[in-house]
Swiss-Prot record:
One of the primary rRNA binding proteins, this protein initially binds near the 5'-end of the 23S rRNA. It is important during the early stages of 50S assembly. It makes multiple contacts with different domains of the 23S rRNA in the assembled 50S subunit and ribosome. Forms part of the polypeptide exit tunnel. Residues 60-71 have a biased composition (Basic residues). This is Large ribosomal subunit protein uL4. GO terms for molecular function: rRNA binding; structural constituent of ribosome. One of its GO terms (cellular component) is ribosome.
Length: 207
């Protein structure tokens, strides 16, 4: 079982914590990670792109010249695709890019992402995280104590307005709950900061 240091809010090591092999010590499956990240990005797409077809562009209702006898190529409308200001053939229309992946693939990817943070020494486990008030300076102090000078994902076990609002104005810092944790965010942010209580919930869900 992987063992990592347990920190307090002052950045001091106050012990260690054993992490579940089934969640934080699995093999990293890059194929599953790729599949889930692509899926998440596809599901975020609005799909509102739209082009006008020949029947939708303005004008072009009259045949520009008679069919035969002019010496020119036959034309039915000045809004056919080959004309300037003509309609688009087979252009994009509003659509949904959303698709689902098997739950098993998602679980494998989540475990792989968490394992990659442990194996890369990019995880900080806090014994507790509590702020008396909404104060960005206090959260910056915690991050400085942990010597986190890059982007970080902060995971807490339950809703806490003081923590969320204290962290939201810090560039490169994002707060997540256990039930909103996702593979893309874990991989996107350099450091993974999680409370001890959140670790227990993650292991309960994914073990």
């Amino acid at each position: 079982m992987p063992k990592v240091d347990l920190y307090n809010m002052k950045g001091e090591v106050v012990g260690d914590i054993q992490l579940s092999d089934n969640v934080f010590g699995t093999d990293v499956n890059k194929d599953a990670l790729h599949a889930v990240v692509v899926n998440q990005l596809a599901n975020r797409r609005q799909g509102t792109q739209s082009t006008k077809t020949k029947s939708e562009v303005r004008g072009g209702g009259k045949k520009p010249w008679r069919q035969k006898g002019t010496g020119r190529a036959r034309q039915g409308s000045i809004r056919s695709a080959q004309w300037v200001k003509g309609g688009i053939v087979l252009g994009p229309k509003p659509r949904s890019y959303r698709y689902t992946l098997p739950k098993k693939v998602k679980r494998i990817a989540m475990k792989s992402a968490l394992t990659s943070k442990v194996s890369g020494n990019e995880i900080f486990v806090l014994d507790a995280l509590a702020l008396d008030a909404i104060k960005t300076k206090s959260m910056v102090g915690v991050l400085n104590n942990l010597k986190v000078d890059s982007s970080a994902l902060l995971v807490i076990d339950s809703k806490n307005e003081n923590i969320v609002k204290s962290a939201r104005n810090i560039p490169g810092i994002k707060t997540a709950y256990v039930n909103t944790l996702n593979v893309f965010d874990i991989l996107k942010y350099d450091k993974f900061i999680i409370t001890k209580d959140a670790v227990e919930k993650v292991e309960e869900v994914y073990a």
